[in-house]
UniProtKB/Swiss-Prot annotation:
Lineage: Eukaryota, Fungi, Dikarya, Ascomycota, Saccharomycotina
Originating species: Saccharomyces cerevisiae (strain RM11-1a) (Baker's yeast)
CDD domains linked: TRX_Fd_Sucrase (cd03062)
Protein name listed in UniProt: Altered inheritance of mitochondria protein 32
UniProt-listed Pfam families: Suc_Fer-like
InterPro entries the record matches: Aim32/Apd1-like, Thioredoxin-like_sf
Coiled-coil stretches: none
Domain of life (superkingdom): Eukaryota
Length: 311
């Protein structure tokens, strides 16, 4: 039984859903700590010698990047492929092979525009079409558009202009700034000048998302834990109707166990409003507790990194 402590949510904008913060009671925490210590020892035994060990006692910071669009480049291959382990370079922008070279090209054409996150993602279920190996098309899923855009490599510049339309008034903390440790965004805005804007149709897929960091070459802790967390989602049948994917680096690799939930609000009205909730120090043994409470509108404070509303 959880002891519930209601707190005021500190966030840049009110969530579309109504959430309460809760804290895990002391007795339950001791049991969780025993499981966590055992799991961390298991993970550390798998890590390369040069990787810093997983330390469950590192304090979880309560901050997330300020953004208004999340662009996911979908990795080719079925869910048993392991691009997150072998194909995603430490820095995705250094990838020269298709399709990942599209990330640096897209970022270049965006010109450092703030408010747009770009990641690679590898789908773990079949609700969205995925590219095949050696596919000539690029598959980008954009949140909160909730649309899959399938484009040619020659369309990247126009696609960047299309994406940037919604970022004109974004704060100046880019995702790259966030990953490099800059905690606060300037409240200034900048003007984006577009050339002729190409409209991209896209195909709508209105489902919630669970994104689990599994970027092995960025930090082996995430690369080892990510598949374990994915397996826990599947074995426990947690949010089985959601899109589930491994995602490249989203910060927080020091403490690892990073999961983003995108929860749609008003999907029946095609409003595309959603809440973005970021968690860290998520382990296979505490994932069920996190998900069950989230489904009931409760956020476990000990794992919460922060969140924003998007529309």
């Amino acid at each position: 039984m959880l002891r519930i402590t209601v707190k005021t949510l500190q966030q840049r904008a009110s969530f579309h859903h109504s959430f309460k913060h809760i804290s895990v009671p002391d007795l339950h925490t001791r049991a969780q700590n025993d499981q966590t210590n055992c799991y961390c020892q298991e993970i550390n035994a798998r890590l390369p010698s040069k990787t810093d060990p997983l330390d469950p006692h590192i304090k979880l910071p309560h901050r997330t990047p300020n953004y208004n669009k999340h662009v996911l480049l979908l990795s080719p291959g079925d869910r048993f492929a392991q691009p997150w382990k072998v194909a995603w370079n430490h820095n995705l922008d250094t990838n020269t092979n298709r399709p990942y070279n599209a990330i640096s090209k897209l970022r270049s054409h965006l010109g450092g525009s703030p408010g747009i996150l770009i990641n690679a993602a590898h789908l773990q279920n079949e609700f969205i079409p995925r590219p095949k190996q050696h596919d000539e098309w690029l598959y980008f899923f954009v949140i909160p558009d909730m649309k899959l855009y399938v484009i040619k490599e020659t369309d990247i510049e126009e696609f960047a202009s299309f994406l940037d339309e919604g970022a004109i008034q974004a704060p100046k903390l880019s995702f790259q700034d966030y990953l490099s440790g800059k905690a606060k965004a300037s409240q200034q805005v900048h003007e984006v000048h577009h050339r002729k804007l190409t409209r991209f149709q896209g195909e709508t897929f209105l489902r919630d998302w669970n994104l689990v960091c599994g970027h092995y070459k960025r930090d082996a802790k995430c690369g080892e834990m990510g598949p374990d967390i994915i397996a826990a989602f599947q074995d426990e049948k947690l949010f089985p109707e959601n899109n589930l994917a491994l995602i490249s680096h989203i910060g927080g690799h020091i403490f690892a166990g990073n999961v983003i939930f995108y929860k749609l609000f008003g999907r029946e009205k095609m409003q595309n409003k959603l809440d973005s909730l970021w968690f860290g120090k998520v382990y296979p043994h505490n994932l069920k507790l996190l998900c069950e409470n989230l489904e009931n509108g409760k956020i476990i404070d000990e794992m919460y990194r922060g969140g924003i509303s998007m529309n």
